C-alpha cells in the first residue's frame, strides 16, 4: 500500500494566532563568531539541547542584540590574539545588556581584556587533551566531573582577571581554564566544550543554556515542521512553486515538506544529467511518483551534458560547464512547464552563514573567504530568473534536515543516503568524462556500495565510493597481459564533512571489493585504497 502524505488543509482549519517562530526565537542563544572553525558546531550543540541558536558576526551591534533579545550570548573562539592590533573586537556595550554571556577560548580572553583583566602569550601553548581540575563545581560546571578531559587549543593565557571574577577550574598549564562573574552572569572557558573530545562539554553547554540562561526547550523537529508548513502556506497562497529535485536528502525533504503544505501547487523537476550512480534515477522516480504519489517531471539530458564535457579535463571547468548546462536546461523546462511564481531551493543554515559572513583574516581582522573548490552542488541559478525564492530549510543544519526527513516519512534510503556531489560521477572521473569511463566508474562504484550494504556497514561511513584515474597499469589476467585502469576506493568517516578520517576497513572486506571490481568491471585491473584524511586532503578528488 502506498504511503500517503497529507496535502493542504481545508479552509475550515484554523491558523494559530501566535506563531511558533516567536516562541522559538524568545528562547534563542546567539553565537558571535570571531572566525572559529567551531562556531557552527557550537550552534549545533545548543540546538541538540532543543534550544534555537544562530551564528552572527562579531560586529553585531548592541542595538541589534537588544532587538533580538536572546536568552544568552556565546563569544566563539578565533585564530587571533586579543592584543593584536587588528584583532576582532565585539562592542563594549555588550557587557551592559544584562544578558548571560559565555566566552569560549578567544571569547573568554576578549571578555577578560575588555573588562579590565590582562591576557598575554602563554609560557607554554596548550593544544589537545588536558585534565580539567574543578575548583567550583556549581553553576556552569555542575555535573562536569573533576579531572575530566577538556580540549585545548590556545597560545595565550589570562594572567589577571577583571574585578568580580573568580576561577572555576584550571589545568596543569592553564591557571584560568574556567572563570565566572556570577553577579553579572558572565562566564568563560579556555577550552572547547563543543568538541567531542571535551568529555563534560555537553553538560557544560546544557548548564549555560538551561540553568544560567533559563531557556525552555522549544526547538524540536515537530515544532519546525509545524512552523515551516504554516509559513509556506502563508507565503505561497494559491501560487505555483517549482523545485529542481536531485534525489539527495535536502531536495527530497524540501519536496515532501512543500507537497504536504501546498499539494499540487508544487511541480518537481528531475534533470538527469547522466552522472548519477547506478540505478539512482529509476529509484528516485519510483519513490516519488509511484510510492508517495508526488509527481516528478523527468528530463533526460544525458547526451547534451556529456557533449559539453567532451575533451575537458580541468575539474573547475567541468563544474562550470555542468552548472551552465544545468541552468540552460532548467530555463528551457521551466518555460515549458510554467508559469511559476516561486522557486524552491534547499538552502541550509551553513550556506546562510557562509554567504553572510566569511572568515576572519588573522593579519587584518577583516573577514575573507578562501575558495578551495567550487561548491559541489549544482546551483548558481541566474539572477534574472523570474521567480521569488522559497527556502524552508534555510535555518537547518544537515543533521537537522535528516531528523525532519525522518519525521515526515521519507524512506531511510534517502534519509541516510551518503552525500553526493551535484556534478556526480563527473568529478570522480579524473580527466575527460566519456560514456565508456562513466560505465566503468558506475559499475565499480556499485560494487563498493553493494558490498558495504551486504556487510551491514553502509551507515558506518560518511561516504564510500570509487574514483577512476586517467592512467593505466600493467596486470596479468588469465595468463594474459592487461593494460587497464586503476580504481581508487575512498571510504571515510566524519561527523559533518568538515573534517574526515579514512576508514579502517577490515582487510577481508577490501579484498572482496577488489576481487569483485577486477573480475566484474571490464577495463579495470588494479584497485588501491586512499588513506588520506581531511585535512590535508579533501573528501572528493576533484
UniProtKB/Swiss-Prot annotation:
SUPFAM superfamilies: Adenine nucleotide alpha hydrolases-like, Class I glutamine amidotransferase-like, GMP synthetase C-terminal dimerisation domain. It comes from the Bacteria. It catalyses: XMP + L-glutamine + ATP + H2O = GMP + L-glutamate + AMP + diphosphate + 2 H(+). Keywords: ATP-binding, Glutamine amidotransferase, GMP biosynthesis, Ligase, Nucleotide-binding, Purine biosynthesis. Residues 28-218 form the Glutamine amidotransferase type-1 domain. GO terms for cellular component: cytosol. The active site is at residues 105, 192, 194. Gene3D superfamilies: 3.30.300.10, 3.40.50.880, HUPs. ATP binds at residues 246-252. Residues 219-417 form the GMPS ATP-PPase domain. Its EC number is 6.3.5.2. The keyword ATP-binding applies. One of its GO terms (molecular function) is GMP synthase activity. Pathway: Purine metabolism; GMP biosynthesis; GMP from XMP (L-Gln route): step 1/1. Homodimer. NCBIfam families: guaA_Cterm (TIGR00884), guaA_Nterm (TIGR00888), PRK00074.1 (NF000848). Catalyzes the synthesis of GMP from XMP. This is GMP synthase [glutamine-hydrolyzing].
Amino acid at each position: 500500500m502506498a504511503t500517503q502524505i497529507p496535502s493542504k488543509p481545508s479552509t475550515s482549519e484554523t491558523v494559530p494566532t501566535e506563531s511558533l517562530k516567536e516562541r522559538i526565537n524568545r528562547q534563542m542563544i546567539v553565537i558571535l563568531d570571531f572566525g572559529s572553525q567551531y562556531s557552527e558546531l557550537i550552534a549545533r550543540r545548543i540546538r541538540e539541547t532543543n534550544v534555537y541558536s544562530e551564528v552572527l558576526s562579531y560586529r553585531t551591534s548592541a542595538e541589534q542584540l537588544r532587538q533580538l533579545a536572546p536568552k544568552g550570548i556565546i563569544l566563539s573562539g578565533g585564530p587571533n590574539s586579543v592584543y593584536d592590533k587588528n584583532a576582532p573586537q565585539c562592542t563594549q556595550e555588550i557587557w551592559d545588556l544584562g544578558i548571560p554571556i559565555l566566552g569560549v577560548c578567544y571569547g573568554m580572553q576578549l571578555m577578560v581584556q575588555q573588562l579590565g583583566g590582562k591576557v598575554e602569550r602563554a609560557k607554554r601553548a596548550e593544544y589537545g587533551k588536558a585534565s580539567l581540575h574543578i575548583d567550583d563545581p556549581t553553576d556552569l560546571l555542575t555535573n562536569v566531573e573533576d579531572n575530566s578531559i577538556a580540549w585545548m587549543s590556545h597560545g595565550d593565557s589570562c594572567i589577571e582577571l577583571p574585578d568580580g571574577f573568580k576561577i572555576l577550574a584550571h589545568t596543569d598549564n592553564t591557571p584560568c581554564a574556567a572563570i565566572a562573574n556570577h553577579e553579572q552572569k558572565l562566564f568563560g572557558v579556555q577550552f572547547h566544550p563543543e568538541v567531542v573530545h571535551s568529555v563534560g562539554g555537553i553538560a557544560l553547554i546544557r548548564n549555560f543554556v538551561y540553568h544560567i540562561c533559563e531557556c525552555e526547550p522549544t526547538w524540536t523537529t515537530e515544532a519546525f515542521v509545524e512552523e515551516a508548513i504554516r509559513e509556506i502556506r502563508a507565503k505561497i497562497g494559491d501560487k505555483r512553486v517549482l523545485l529542481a529535485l536531485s534525489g539527495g536528502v535536502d531536495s527530497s525533504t524540501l519536496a515532501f515538506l512543500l507537497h504536504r503544505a501546498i499539494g499540487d501547487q508544487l511541480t518537481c523537476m528531475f534533470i538527469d544529467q547522466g552522472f548519477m550512480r547506478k540505478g539512482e534515477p529509476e529509484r528516485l522516480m519510483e519513490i516519488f511518483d509511484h510510492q508517495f504519489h508526488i509527481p516528478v517531471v523527468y528530463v533526460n539530458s544525458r547526451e547534451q551534458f556529456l557533449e559539453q564535457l567532451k575533451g575537458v579535463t580541468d575539474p573547475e571547468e567541468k563544474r562550470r560547464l555542468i552548472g551552465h548546462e544545468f541552468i540552460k536546461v532548467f530555463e528551457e523546462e521551466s518555460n515549458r512547464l510554467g508559469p511559476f511564481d516561486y522557486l524552491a531551493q534547499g538552502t541550509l543554515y551553513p550556506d546562510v552563514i557562509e554567504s553572510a559572513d566569511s572568515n576572519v583574516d588573522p593579519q587584518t581582522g577583516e573577514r575573507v573567504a578562501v575558495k578551495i573548490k567550487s561548491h559541489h552542488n549544482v546551483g548558481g541559478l541566474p539572477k534574472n530568473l523570474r521567480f521569488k525564492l522559497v527556502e524552508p530549510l534555510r535555518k537547518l543544519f544537515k543533521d537537522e534536515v535528516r531528523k525532519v526527513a525522518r519525521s515526515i516519512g521519507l524512506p531511510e534510503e534517502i534519509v541516510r543516503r551518503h552525500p553526493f556531489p551535484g556534478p556526480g560521477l563527473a568529478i570522480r572521473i579524473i580527466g575527460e568524462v566519456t560514456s565508456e569511463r562513466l560505465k566503468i566508474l558506475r559499475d565499480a562504484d556499485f560494487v563498493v556500495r553493494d558490498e558495504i550494504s551486504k556487510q551491514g556497514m553502509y551507515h558506518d561511513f560518511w561516504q564510500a565510493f570509487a574514483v577512476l584515474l586517467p592512467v593505466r597499469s600493467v596486470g596479468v589476467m588469465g595468463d594474459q597481459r592487461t593494460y587497464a585502469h586503476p580504481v581508487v576506493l575512498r571510504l571515510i568517516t566524519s561527523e559533518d564533512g568538515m573534517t574526515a578520517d579514512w576508514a579502517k576497513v577490515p582487510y577481508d572486506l577490501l579484498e572482496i571489493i577488489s576481487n569483485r571490481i577486477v573480475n566484474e568491471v571490464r577495463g579495470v585491473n588494479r584497485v588501491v585504497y586512499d588513506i588520506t584524511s581531511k585535512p590535508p586532503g579533501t573528501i572528493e578528488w576533484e
